[in-house]
Amino acid sequence: MRSAKLKFEKRRSRIRHKISKTSNRVRLSIFKSGRHIYAQIIDDSKSITIAAASTLDEKRKKSHCNIEHAIKVGEEIAKKAYAAGIKDVVFDRGGYKYHGVVKALADAAREKIKF
């Protein structure tokens, strides 16, 4: 039987492989820890991070990874992307299942940028 970490890594690599086929768009990448959630907009062709937002920002220093704060992070990353002139991204859920905080962040970001 496979361990949970191995299943996660397999899901993650499968998602990245599918995303690599759409190299003409930038990628909205999600990372979740036990306490915080992070979002980055990455241009893989230039290997640079264009915008980033997380619950670690000064405004939300004591906040944790829950749906309420994931919505705020999603709105913030969408605002930063729109300011940078990005209107179209590929969503990289990073091996996480699409529910809870990942879904909340994605839905909040969809209001300003197109997936």
Curated annotation (Swiss-Prot):
Any one Gene Ontology molecular-function term assigned to this protein's record: structural constituent of ribosome
A Pfam family per the record: Ribosomal_L18p
InterPro entries xrefs: Ribosomal_uL18_bac-type, Ribosomal_uL18_bac/euk
UniProt keyword annotation of 4Fe-4S present: no
Biological processes annotated in GO: translation
The keyword Lyase belongs to this UniProt entry's keyword annotation: no
GO CC terms of this entry: cytosolic large ribosomal subunit
Source superkingdom: Bacteria
Known role: This is one of the proteins that bind and probably mediate the attachment of the 5S RNA into the large ribosomal subunit, where it forms part of the central protuberance.
Family: Belongs to the universal ribosomal protein uL18 family.
NCBIfam families: L18_bact
HAMAP family, per database record: Ribosomal_uL18_B
Record's subunit section: Part of the 50S ribosomal subunit; part of the 5S rRNA/L5/L18/L25 subcomplex. Contacts the 5S and 23S rRNAs.
The protein, known as: Large ribosomal subunit protein uL18
